[in-house]
Curated annotation (Swiss-Prot):
ATP binds at G10, F11, S12, S13, C14, G15, K16, S17, T18. GO terms for cellular component: cytosol. One of its GO terms (molecular function) is ATP binding. Signal peptide: none annotated. This is Cytidylate kinase.
Amino acid sequence: MKKITIAIDGFSSCGKSTMAKDLAKEIGYIYIDSGAMYRAVTLYSIENGIFHGDTIDTDELKRRIGDIHISFRIDPETGRPNTYLNGVNVENKIRTMEVSSKVSPISALGFVREAMVAQQQEMGKAKGIVMDGRDIGTTVFPDAELKIFVTASAEIRAQRRYDELKAKGQETGFEEILENVKQRDHIDQTREVSPLKKADDALLLDNSHLTIAEQKEWLMAEYQKAIKA
């Protein structure tokens, strides 16, 4: 059976990562979480004094970007990949509200995207991968055989994020999360480098009112079509 590249793009908190992880596990592909890579760069910047309040010392980050190496390793207990920053597991650290509130401006920096895209393209050379993010189908893998663009209303996405953080014991107000979601949408869609947009040949999936099972059924059907094409 031929192996393909699957690119899943879309807005923040649409459940892209869960969807991509589950699909990769189901079909035996490698999953690459591009959003986690930008979160890891953000965490590195926070921990290394590159942020001064909300201001990024771009010159310092540019000097250090070559020292930031991100990889994914499967957790033997969960069967899911964890994100490693320079050899250290940072999967939980990169999911905090502090990182969420700072990741969009980091992602908007051209030299950061250039470095991450190079790492992603290296990971994806052998095909048989599922990658999710903002510009996978448009910039990272424009020749991907299956491209999906995921959307849902801002309110539904904020509620999902609220529930996710609450389950982890991180208490944050719904309004703050909704504002963060809307702010990230604006930054992601208007940035100069690789703005968030649907590739012309991507399939649109609005999962506002879909169950996980319905979404999975749709994805598997599209995957089957793509490998037979």
